């Protein structure tokens, strides 16, 4: 399992609805920021992946709203990749406020797809090389 913590960020006024709560559609943006930065922390980027002819469309997205995040809250997003990617990669998210309260959880599943044919493909070896050591450590603990 690999987990990455996105640096804390403040909820901006533009992120909220009339009630001062984070607008529900913005959580998907928070997820994307987390995914991109988690992969970047591994030394892997979406830009390089796309340049190599592989895309990662979202296949499934789920969200659970436990408590509202509000304007000016300081949020942290923990991003976890719970299993070694194959033809798909799963990201799990936990969003907390500055008091550490769990406000929101979510999960996205993305698939690896060849840009030229649109067909599914295996996870790129470069990504596996970067992430596999985290899963090898887990095997050693059992």
Report residues per predicted region.
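Alpha-helix boundary/capping residues
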Residues: 34, 46, 56, 134-138
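HotDog/MaoC-like acyl-thioester-processing domains
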Residues: 3-7, 70-71, 81-142
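Hydrophobic beta-strand-centered segment that forms part of the acyl-chain substrate-binding groove
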Residues: 38-76, 80-90, 103, 111
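Catalytic strand-loop segment that frames the active site of acyl-thioester-processing enzymes
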Residues: 1-38, 44
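Generic structural detector for well-ordered beta-strands
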Residues: 8-12, 64, 109
């Amino acid at each position: 399992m690999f987990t990455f913590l996105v640096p804390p960020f403040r909820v901006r006024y533009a992120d909220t609805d009339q009630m001062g709560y984070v607008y529900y559609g913005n959580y998907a943006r928070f997820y994307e920021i987390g995914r991109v930065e988690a992969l970047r922390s591994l030394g892997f980027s979406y830009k390089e992946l796309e340049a190599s002819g592989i895309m990662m469309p979202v296949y499934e997205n789920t969200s659970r709203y436990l408590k509202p995040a509000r304007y000016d809250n300081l949020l942290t997003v923990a991003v976890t990749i719970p299993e070694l990617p194959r033809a798909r990669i799963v990201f799990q998210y936990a969003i907390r406020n500055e008091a550490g309260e769990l406000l929101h959880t979510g999960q996205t599943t993305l698939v690896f797809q060849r840009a030229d044919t649109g067909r599914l493909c295996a996870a790129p070896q470069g990504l596996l090389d970067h992430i596999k050591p985290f899963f090898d450590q887990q095997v050693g603990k059992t």
